[in-house]
Amino acid sequence: MAKNLILVSHGTFCEELKNSTEMIMGPQTNIYPVPLLPSEGAEDFKEKFLSVVENLDDYIVFADLLGGTPCNVVSRLLMEGYHFELYAGMNMPMVIGFLNGVLLGSEVDIIHYGKEKYSSCE
Protein backbone atom coordinates (compact mmCIF):
# COMPACT_ATOMS: atom_id res chain seq x y z
CA MET A 1 0.00 0.00 0.00
CA ALA A 2 1.14 3.54 -0.76
CA LYS A 3 2.56 5.46 2.17
CA ASN A 4 1.62 8.97 1.03
CA LEU A 5 -1.81 10.41 0.29
CA ILE A 6 -2.45 13.32 -2.07
CA LEU A 7 -5.82 15.05 -1.71
CA VAL A 8 -6.97 17.14 -4.70
CA SER A 9 -10.07 19.31 -4.78
CA HIS A 10 -11.86 22.40 -5.95
CA GLY A 11 -11.03 25.13 -3.45
CA THR A 12 -9.68 24.35 -0.01
CA PHE A 13 -11.82 21.27 0.65
CA CYS A 14 -8.71 19.06 0.53
CA GLU A 15 -6.90 21.22 3.09
CA GLU A 16 -9.88 21.25 5.43
CA LEU A 17 -10.38 17.50 5.03
CA LYS A 18 -6.79 17.02 6.16
CA ASN A 19 -7.34 19.40 9.09
CA SER A 20 -10.53 17.61 10.14
CA THR A 21 -8.85 14.21 9.87
CA GLU A 22 -6.01 15.44 12.08
CA MET A 23 -8.55 16.38 14.76
CA ILE A 24 -9.34 12.66 14.98
CA MET A 25 -6.06 10.97 14.03
CA GLY A 26 -3.48 13.53 15.15
CA PRO A 27 -0.88 15.27 12.96
CA GLN A 28 -0.27 13.58 9.60
CA THR A 29 2.98 14.15 7.73
CA ASN A 30 2.08 11.86 4.83
CA ILE A 31 -1.02 13.76 3.60
CA TYR A 32 -0.51 16.44 0.95
CA PRO A 33 -3.47 18.63 -0.04
CA VAL A 34 -3.39 20.20 -3.51
CA PRO A 35 -6.24 22.68 -3.97
CA LEU A 36 -7.41 24.13 -7.27
CA LEU A 37 -8.05 27.77 -6.38
CA PRO A 38 -10.54 30.01 -8.23
CA SER A 39 -7.71 32.07 -9.75
CA GLU A 40 -5.98 28.97 -11.19
CA GLY A 41 -6.48 27.00 -14.37
CA ALA A 42 -5.81 23.37 -15.23
CA GLU A 43 -2.18 24.03 -16.20
CA ASP A 44 -1.51 25.87 -12.92
CA PHE A 45 -3.02 22.98 -11.01
CA LYS A 46 -0.95 20.42 -12.93
CA GLU A 47 2.27 22.29 -12.11
CA LYS A 48 1.29 22.52 -8.44
CA PHE A 49 0.43 18.80 -8.30
CA LEU A 50 3.70 17.79 -9.98
CA SER A 51 5.73 19.95 -7.59
CA VAL A 52 4.12 18.12 -4.65
CA VAL A 53 4.71 14.61 -5.98
CA GLU A 54 8.14 15.10 -7.57
CA ASN A 55 9.96 13.83 -4.47
CA LEU A 56 7.45 11.13 -3.51
CA ASP A 57 8.09 7.56 -4.64
CA ASP A 58 4.85 5.99 -3.52
CA TYR A 59 1.52 7.78 -3.31
CA ILE A 60 -2.20 7.42 -3.87
CA VAL A 61 -4.53 10.25 -4.93
CA PHE A 62 -8.04 11.01 -3.71
CA ALA A 63 -10.05 13.56 -5.73
CA ASP A 64 -13.19 15.37 -4.70
CA LEU A 65 -15.27 14.86 -7.84
CA LEU A 66 -15.15 12.51 -10.82
CA GLY A 67 -15.10 14.64 -13.96
CA GLY A 68 -13.93 17.79 -12.16
CA THR A 69 -10.79 19.63 -13.17
CA PRO A 70 -8.55 18.30 -10.35
CA CYS A 71 -9.52 14.69 -11.10
CA ASN A 72 -9.27 15.20 -14.87
CA VAL A 73 -5.81 16.77 -14.66
CA VAL A 74 -4.53 13.95 -12.46
CA SER A 75 -6.14 11.23 -14.62
CA ARG A 76 -4.36 12.67 -17.68
CA LEU A 77 -1.07 12.14 -15.83
CA LEU A 78 -1.97 8.45 -15.54
CA MET A 79 -2.47 8.35 -19.31
CA GLU A 80 0.94 10.02 -19.72
CA GLY A 81 2.64 7.17 -17.84
CA TYR A 82 2.65 8.21 -14.19
CA HIS A 83 1.98 5.33 -11.80
CA PHE A 84 -0.38 5.79 -8.85
CA GLU A 85 -3.93 4.92 -7.85
CA LEU A 86 -6.64 7.55 -8.26
CA TYR A 87 -10.01 7.51 -6.49
CA ALA A 88 -12.78 10.11 -6.87
CA GLY A 89 -15.46 11.05 -4.36
CA MET A 90 -13.13 11.43 -1.39
CA ASN A 91 -14.51 11.66 2.10
CA MET A 92 -13.23 11.40 5.66
CA PRO A 93 -13.90 7.64 6.03
CA MET A 94 -11.68 7.04 2.97
CA VAL A 95 -8.86 9.13 4.45
CA ILE A 96 -9.12 7.49 7.89
CA GLY A 97 -9.28 4.04 6.27
CA PHE A 98 -6.12 4.82 4.30
CA LEU A 99 -4.32 6.03 7.44
CA ASN A 100 -5.37 2.95 9.41
CA GLY A 101 -4.03 0.75 6.61
CA VAL A 102 -0.68 2.55 6.69
CA LEU A 103 -0.50 2.27 10.50
CA LEU A 104 -1.34 -1.44 10.43
CA GLY A 105 0.71 -2.19 7.32
CA SER A 106 -2.30 -3.73 5.61
CA GLU A 107 -4.17 -3.29 2.36
CA VAL A 108 -7.36 -1.24 2.54
CA ASP A 109 -10.39 -1.51 0.27
CA ILE A 110 -10.69 2.20 -0.52
CA ILE A 111 -13.89 1.67 -2.52
CA HIS A 112 -15.49 0.10 0.57
CA TYR A 113 -14.68 3.16 2.66
CA GLY A 114 -15.88 5.43 -0.11
CA LYS A 115 -19.34 3.95 -0.50
CA GLU A 116 -20.15 1.55 2.32
CA LYS A 117 -19.73 3.96 5.22
CA TYR A 118 -22.96 5.86 4.63
CA SER A 119 -25.83 5.46 7.10
CA SER A 120 -29.19 7.00 7.73
CA CYS A 121 -29.38 8.95 10.97
CA GLU A 122 -33.18 8.91 11.19
Predicted segments — roles?
Residues 2-62, 66-122:
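N-terminal loops that bind phosphate or other acidic moieties
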